[in-house]
Amino acid sequence: MKKIYVAGGCFWGVQGFLKTIKGIKKTTVGYANSLLENPTYELVKSHVTDAVETVEVIYDENILSLKDIVKKLFAVIDPTARNYQGPDHGRQYRNGFYFVDQEDGVMLRELMLEFSKKYEKPLATEILPLDNYYLAEDYHQDYFDKHPNAVCHIKF
């Protein structure tokens, strides 16, 4: 199993979408690369943490490649949008991939060069090592399982 941290706007929709993909075994939502330890949603949305709403993804690389994950995410978000997706605005909604394996970092940078040729505007996608990840509050976990009619920037 491999692990990657994915951001693409509000983490509710990103998690809901990723859970539909064959090969993804487990997801959680949380806050990545925070300047403060153990940030809360209230702190994140106040912009004092610089954390990004992120989905931790554990996947079977024998079924799904990192490139597949990038391609599928880019099909449902705007990777050229800086600090927003859909109606959600703010740095916590930026898009990116945060890696724990240096080889994944190299691969992601190569993929960004490849995918950038498909867009007129430059990609705003962050590719950074994961400095930290804190689980979001329980009410954020698997949000669309609990609230299937909630509004989302991602259609799935």
From Swiss-Prot:
Catalytic activity: L-methionyl-[protein] + [thioredoxin]-disulfide + H2O = L-methionyl-(S)-S-oxide-[protein] + [thioredoxin]-dithiol; [thioredoxin]-disulfide + L-methionine + H2O = L-methionine (S)-S-oxide + [thioredoxin]-dithiol
NCBIfam families (UniProt xref): msrA
Function: Has an important function as a repair enzyme for proteins that have been inactivated by oxidation. Catalyzes the reversible oxidation-reduction of methionine sulfoxide in proteins to methionine.
Keyword tags: Oxidoreductase
GO molecular function, one term: peptide-methionine (S)-S-oxide reductase activity
The enzyme's E.C. designation: 1.8.4.11
PANTHER family registered for this protein in UniProt: MITOCHONDRIAL PEPTIDE METHIONINE SULFOXIDE REDUCTASE
GO CC terms: cytoplasm
InterPro entries (alphabetical): Met_Sox_Rdtase_MsrA_dom (IPR002569), Met_Sox_Rdtase_MsrA_sf (IPR036509), MsrA_MetSO_reductase (IPR050162)
Organism: Metamycoplasma arthritidis (strain 158L3-1)
Active site as annotated: 10
Record-level GO BP terms: cellular response to oxidative stress; protein modification process
Superkingdom: Bacteria
Family from the record: Belongs to the MsrA Met sulfoxide reductase family.
Keyword Oxidoreductase carried by entry: yes
HAMAP family cross-referenced by the UniProt entry: MsrA
Pfam families given in the database record: PMSR
UniProt name for this protein: Peptide methionine sulfoxide reductase MsrA
Enzyme class: oxidoreductase
